[in-house]
């Protein structure tokens, strides 16, 4: 198995290559990642909803040693990444980070939320700082209201912003 610090650097180079091939190539890759991730999260969402998402990201928090806070209420899950280990590893590298590295998270999570009827608001805040806020809502009106507070709102394949 490839160590995570090598994996994220490899991912960064793959993203840069695909970006050089055009937006369609990059989005196709993100959609492939999304389909793969369905094996890990789709059943949790379909059977447990927001609680299943909370379970999934709690496991990721431990597995990837993330400095993140999770907050769950009846209509919303908020994931506040205080220090993203993935972007941190990419930035601690002699190769230039892909300018849109953070976009891959929305690129795989967004299509799953669309598929399951949830509404995602993904605020990267600043692509050069390893932090973000992901909010997932049951209610589309609450999601639209939350979008107004985002500093750098992300889109994903099938949902463009801006």
Cite the ranges covered by each PLM segment.
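N-terminal accessory segment detector
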Residues: 1-103, 114, 119-133, 137-162
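ATP phosphate-binding glycine-rich loop and adjacent ATP-lid/helix-beta elements
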Residues: 104-109
